[in-house]
């Protein structure tokens, strides 16, 4: 049989495979979502509230996180839009994990938990120290002292997870690569379509904030050489002399 010129619908939230072998993402906001939701539909919340202009025709409010703003026209092409949506969700999830990983060890260290190095951008260099990395004093993690071993584990484990996500599982069953469900949803958070639609919005809102936070952490590391919590403590102790403007006017790269 041939699929030429036809679109095969695989699952309610899965991509459509078209005859030209290109993928287009179907909307993930279920039709059963209440029309009263403030995050979906033509009457959804806009980026400037009541002062927002008319959104582009291709931003109809069917996807989570659509506030009707696309000055650069990045979402005008459906295929590019589908790809960017997937990239945003994946980067949001990594950013949320990364932001937690940057702050939590430093928080524990400031409360008496001993680390070899708690500041996120300095921790990796400890592998070159005489004692190597200190995983909370656990001697069973000796293999994590090897850069090659760490690299190999990252390639194998992350490659397997990404391959599983994109291919739809080890048996090749088709799932939504952004919201795979099934064994990835052991708590059944997606069972209620309306609750699931709201969770998608919350995930993107928190993910976008986390991406900005990670950008701020990188800038802080370059400019101050300190972790985020230490920078926060310095600012609270002396907000006049420890703020973005003060550092921007005195910052000399490389010094």
From Swiss-Prot:
Presence of the UniProt keyword Membrane in the record: yes
Binding site for chlorophyll b 5: 154, 251
Main localisation: plastid
Residues the record lists as binding chlorophyll b 4: 154, 165
Mode of membrane association: Multi-pass membrane protein
UniProt KW keywords: Acetylation, Chlorophyll, Chloroplast, Chromophore, Magnesium, Membrane, Metal-binding, Phosphoprotein, Photosynthesis, Photosystem I, Photosystem II, Plastid, Thylakoid, Transit peptide, Transmembrane, Transmembrane helix
Entry GO terms, CC: chloroplast thylakoid membrane; photosystem I; photosystem II
Residues bound to chlorophyll a 4: 206
Transit peptide: 1-25
Location of N2-acetylarginine modifications: 26
Cofactor note: Binds at least 14 chlorophylls (8 Chl-a and 6 Chl-b) and carotenoids such as lutein and neoxanthin.
Transmembrane region(s): 89-109, 141-161, 209-229
Binding site residues for chlorophyll a 1: 69, 75, 88, 208
Chain residues that bind chlorophyll b 3: 146, 162
Localization of this protein: Plastid, Chloroplast thylakoid membrane
Binding-site list for chlorophyll b 1: 47
Subunit (UniProt): The LHC complex consists of chlorophyll a-b binding proteins.
UniProt note: domains: The N-terminus of the protein extends into the stroma where it is involved with adhesion of granal membranes and post-translational modifications; both are believed to mediate the distribution of excitation energy between photosystems I and II.
Protein name: Chlorophyll a-b binding protein of LHCII type I, chloroplastic
Species, as recorded: Cucumis sativus (Cucumber)
